[in-house]
Amino acid sequence: ILDVKYYVLLPSASYIGSSLDNVQWSTILRSVSGEGGFQMSYGQRPKPREIAQFLILDNRMPRSLIFCANKIVSNLQYLQKDAEQAPPSSAMANRLLMLEKDIDQIFDDGLHEYIQNFLLQNAELARQVEVDYRFYR
């Protein structure tokens, strides 16, 4: 959702900060049931960087990327507790946590690039979990 908002929804860069831009950001929060949690954490007037921070790096938001990555690591630790050796998916999941940066660095490096990299690593992790735990079709 963030990637689409960032690249597709605004007709041009001149609309950044406009009422259209602000409505779109608020709609994103509502679409992930995050408006109330965001307002409790950041206040009433949403700013794009704060919304991105909330949806990517805020562990208090159950749909944030970092919250989900932490849950993946936790669940894989549970699955491997009786294993003699940690499977490759364990290290891959921990690498997802290492993608955590501050939001300014993410915006400086490129939000689109960050999200694409996260999605790519998440897809590779999913394939490895399938192999490690024999979730074949």
Listing of model-derived features with the role each one plays in the protein:
Residues 1-137:
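Alpha-helical transmembrane segments and their helix-helix packing motifs
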